[in-house]
Structures are given as structure tokens and as C-alpha cells.
Amino acid sequence: FTVFITGASSGIGAALAQEYAQKGAVVGLVGRRREVLEEVRARMNHPQNHEIYAADVTVETELHDAARAFIAKHGAPDVVIAAAGISVGTWTEYYEDLAHIRRVFETNVFAMASTFHPFIAPMKAARKGALVGIASVAGIRGLPGSEAYCASKAAVISYCESLRGELRDSGISVLTISPGYVATPLTAKN
């Protein structure tokens, strides 16, 4: 059983990596900070079985190189989880916040598509696999000062719903997880 997880250095991604390792999966851990990924891997069952890929999910070539390396070693994974995400308080009235809004969408939405893309063809060939997008209940209701995060998670919900329809006859499942508040390093900053 193999699992590829972005955002694996902390929060939901790290927790899922540990949970899957406990159940015997081989896990590919993706995050920007190699040293933090190594700490996560050290806490996992059978750390030598898991792969580390230091990559920024907003840099497609880095992400696709990680995906190709995982596929070359383990084949198409059983599960791909796009858990990388950021949240920055934003107010649209402030010009400088427009760049923050763009960065939130690049990480939370566009990187999810980039995460899933390299796995679709091999999963189709295998006629199995699951693509999992981490959304949020914040994608259902907007919150003042959180418009970038809320809108990005609403986009994730719609994107995954659309992708589910696109892949419905392929053997690939597309799942959306919309957790409520979870105490993570991300939420601690908000």
C-alpha cells in the first residue's frame, strides 16, 4: 500500500503520514523543508520505508520530479493526498494583500491540480487509486479577513467535485475532506 502526501511536514499532512505508516503503508513525504520531513519520518513506523521529497508545491517542476521519482520506485500510488496549504489574513482593500491572495490560491488550489496531474495517467492505466483534496469547512462560508483562504477552499471543493466527474469511469476515486478547526501550526498563526 503506497501513499504520496504533500504538506507532510506539519499539521494534517504529517498526521496522515504517521497514520498511514502505522497501518503499514509506504509513504512519500513532500514538503519544502527536508530537515522537518526527516523529523516527521523519524517518528513514523519503519522510517527506512518512507521517501522524502523536498519540493515546493508551487514549483511544478519540483513537484513533478518528486512524483516521477515516487512512481519510478513504487509504481502508481494507491492514494495521493494534497494536504499542502497556507492561510494568510487578507483584506482586499489593501493593495499589498492582493499578492497574498494570489499566493494562497497558488498553494491551495493550483498546486493541488499540479499534485494530482502526474498521477492520473498511471492510475488510469492501473484502473485504481484515490486522489484526496484537503479542503475546509471554511470553503462553505466566508469569514472576514479570511477571504483568500475561504475562497481557495471553496475552489478546492468545486475542483474536486469536477475532477470526480471527469474521472468517474477511470477506476480513480476523488475524495474531498473538509475538516473543521484543527489545531496545527497553520491555525496557530491565525
Feature annotation, model-predicted:
Residues 44-61:
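Rossmann-fold cofactor-recognition segment
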Residues 93, 143-147, 190:
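Active-site loop immediately N-terminal to the catalytic Tyr-X3-Lys motif
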Residues 116, 152:
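Active-site helix of classical SDR
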Residues 136:
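Residue(s) in the substrate-gating loop at a strand-loop-helix junction
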Residues 86, 97-113, 128, 132, ...:
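Catalytic Tyr-X3-Lys loop
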Residues 23-40:
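Conserved glycine-rich Rossmann-like NAD(P)H-binding loop of the short-chain dehydrogenase/reductase
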